[in-house]
Amino acid sequence: MRFLFLMITLTALTGYILADEQPTFRWAVVHDPSIIKVGNMYYVFGTHLQVAKSKDLMHWEQINTSAHDKNPIIPNINEELKETLSWARTRNDIWAPQVIQLSDGRYYMYYCASTFGSPRSAIGIAVSDDIEGPYKHYAVIVKSGQVYSVDGPSEDGTPYDSRKHPNALDPGVFYDKEGNLWMVYGSWFGGIYILKLDPNTGLPLPGQGYGKRLVGGNHSSMEGPYILYSPDTDYYYLFLSFGGLDYRGGYNIRVARSKNPNGPYYDPEGKSMENCMGSKTVISNYGAKLVGNFILSESNTIDFKAFGYVSPGHNSAYYDPETGKYFIFFHTRFPGRGETYQLRVHQLFLNEDGWFVMAPFPYGGETVSKLPNEEIVGEYQFINHGKEITDKIKQPVRIKLNSDGSITGAVEGRWERKEHYITLKIIEGNTTVIYKGVLLKQWHYSEKKWVTVFTALSNQGVSVWGIRVEE
């Protein structure tokens, strides 16, 4: 009993004593992962019909790897999804599926197919009684890329215009707090749109055309929308990926928020995302950038053992009502490894201003709690993710959080903490920029030990991370 009391006390003090004190990981290969939890099992569905499952978010079992005709998720896929695939002029492939359970207890897979690099795309639905399939064709609900002389008008009754009409890709289906069903979707071309769905049938309510534009247009470089409601803040959070998805494309994850599921959405500076369209330079000024390219190495050459990501993006997110934790699921490439990619899962936290910040390392079972000052004061690797869309890989600089509240080293300023929250006041040129975030212990993915980290966000939508250099 004394030992149990000691363990509980230590857990309360440190927040990192876990059932598995040295977490291990087994990752799956899933591009554009979307999350659904069924019972005690998490499932992710991704492009090429890559599917995996896990009970702890750390050890993933690959269920399926490709959309061949003998796959168990959608057997005989070319015939089963013939209507969608024939419109998109493709075979043996679907992109960015998401599965949601409707009131009839069945599982509805919203998926898309496309002629690569063009807006000739369609979003369809397949349905199954079991989360792992087999799924059967149900409906095609949105088409894009119509050639007027051949296909007639677009979904809104006018000739299709790729500058203002959406590309029917990347469906993200969600319930709002009132139980209404919505689908956000879009990729490049005319921007990101949202449609209201019938919660009983899963089909779009009539008379909406393509729905309402939330962000983008004029071929702006953004895609992979996903909306998550937070009961803690009563906001809806719109996640997006800016940039190109390949290892040279500068893919990065951004977020904006709204009090309404169909917007308008605003970034931390209060800018409306409806105005976010244009070149990469223009759109990079919008949204809170949670993560982009980085490596925790200070070497001038690539250290293949160092922890880092390249083009992380196309995420989904999940709120666990039992634990109160938020998670983000995304694919990422890696420094020096070309187009190789895997699934990753990180924990999200709400800062004092109600904005999400992302933990630097993959989820290892940690729970945020108040840390003693002696585990905070010290030297850190410091990453500033900036706002730009770039293929450059951010590297850390060294800073110190001193016991007198000062920050010294490559950046200077002041820091203070309140419970598990941290505020950094960093001098940048002639101004002081305030970053608000959280402190916690995380399992250092490459060094295999628990370290103190912080993750924080400025009112300009810039994320910074600190990883304590443990002796």
Swiss-Prot record:
What enzyme category does the UniProt record give? hydrolase
Keyword vocabulary terms for this entry: Calcium, Carbohydrate metabolism, Glycosidase, Hydrolase, Metal-binding, Secreted, Signal
- One Pfam family assigned to this protein is Glyco_hydro_43
Under which pathway is this protein filed? Glycan metabolism; L-arabinan degradation
The cellular component terms of Gene Ontology attached to this UniProt record, alphabetical and capped at eight, are: extracellular region
- Which Gene Ontology MF annotations are present? arabinan endo-1,5-alpha-L-arabinosidase activity; metal ion binding
Question: What does the annotation say about its assembly with partners?
Answer: Monomer.
- Function in brief: Involved in the degradation of arabinan and is a key enzyme in the complete degradation of the plant cell wall. Catalyzes the internal cleavage of alpha-(1->5)-L-arabinofuranosyl residues in different arabinan-containing polysaccharides, and releases arabinotriose and arabinobiose as end products. It acts on branched arabinan (from sugar beet), but more slowly when compared to linear or debranched arabinan.
**Protein name in UniProt:** Extracellular endo-alpha-(1->5)-L-arabinanase
Organism of origin:
Thermotoga petrophila (strain ATCC BAA-488 / DSM 13995 / JCM 10881 / RKU-1)
